[in-house]
């Protein structure tokens, strides 16, 4: 059979049949229709609230994707990243004063609870919000399998081991492999850096003294380097931000990969996908392919999001009333 796609208003809609053929199996306890009777308006409620959030701050789309990523990489997609407390994942080094969007999830949860009290998990709400953030920014849409439970504990130590923008490519690939994701997932999910912002603290090491020899990262395009040195001077405010993709700051597209071919990746972990020695036999060809075909990127990104969203720890857990605390 032929796979089918529809292009609608700039969005790519991949059919369920196509996704089933292209992506690895979703965990058995997850189903797109699990709330069809218990919360029939769930999808519309979440999308409406995400629209409101993006209208208030367009950057929130990228923030919700990142929040979902940081959740799924620690104990699976169980909304543990949303929990408050002394061992909160929010306080882990990669997350503190960095990961954002918690208030948006609170607002969505309140709207869902008003319609369907005690039915829908925070983990499912976060997964749907991430999907809608992509779609509403011009990216692909896909059916989200639902039925995740909310975790009962946070894991700050594991959150401290999230993939870092300062790590070499082999370390990043290994961390993805440790949770069951492959090299294609590394590149496709990195494509989420096609929108959003990054703080100077996350890339200023590339601008002046990258190797300890007093020189910048040689893979960084010179005009971009000069601009970034102005934005993030030595001794400057590390909390200032720069767009991850200057070509289309708030749009979900394949410009991120085109940037990498020109040495315009903002983070070291972005540019090494194309420019590092290890990339030659691992990630470089995918970067080149995605730069040529937005459809191919959208297809693989969708599959990677489905795989990542299927990282769950069995059926244990609960449906939290408040996403910040266990019941």
Swiss-Prot record:
It is an enzyme of class 1 (oxidoreductase). GO terms for cellular component: extracellular region. It comes from the Eukaryota. InterPro entries: Haem_peroxidase, Haem_peroxidase_sf, Peroxidase_pln, Peroxidases_AS, Peroxidases_heam-ligand_BS, Secretory_peroxidase. The modification Pyrrolidone carboxylic acid is found at residue 29. GO terms for molecular function: heme binding; lactoperoxidase activity; metal ion binding. Ca(2+) 2 binds at residues 194, 245, 248, 253. Binds 2 calcium ions per subunit. Binds 1 heme b (iron(II)-protoporphyrin IX) group per subunit. Its EC number is 1.11.1.7. This is Peroxidase N. The gene is HRPN.
